[in-house]
Amino acid sequence: MMVRLDQMNSEEFQKYLSFAIKYFADEQIKSGNWKLEEAISKATVEYEKLLPEGQDTENNHLFTIRDGSKEVGMIWLAQITNEKGFIYGLNIWEGNQGKGYGKKTMQEIEVLAKKFGLKSIGLHVFAHNNIARDLYEKLGYKEKNIKMEKTL
């Protein structure tokens, strides 16, 4: 496996954005945060705030993950301050999951983050996403906050 991170072009970004809005909306519904009828519009607003200039939004680095010429996923790293980064998205496309692409991508993004001068990287993972939580813990990411809620 030879993982390479290539800056997204506009076509790849549009494909990612369509996927990401739906995925984020679905995850918010699963978590009990949003209702079905409002989820897509709320997710769209969030992405418009985070990426007002699309893939050209300053301090945001959106990459297509490739294994050779094959597209296997995407990762989005935002530079929050001069020293802190935040991964807003890591998605390995269906059919490519469970093959080590997530782990290798995280290792590659850490190399790039250091080149950008970052000293730390944060990320968010939904509590129900045990596969992602396990991966991040194995890579040395530590929980900093835990939000808990009870539905009545």
Model-based region annotation:
Residues 96, 100-108:
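Conserved acetyl-CoA pyrophosphate-binding loop and the N-cap/start of the following alpha-helix
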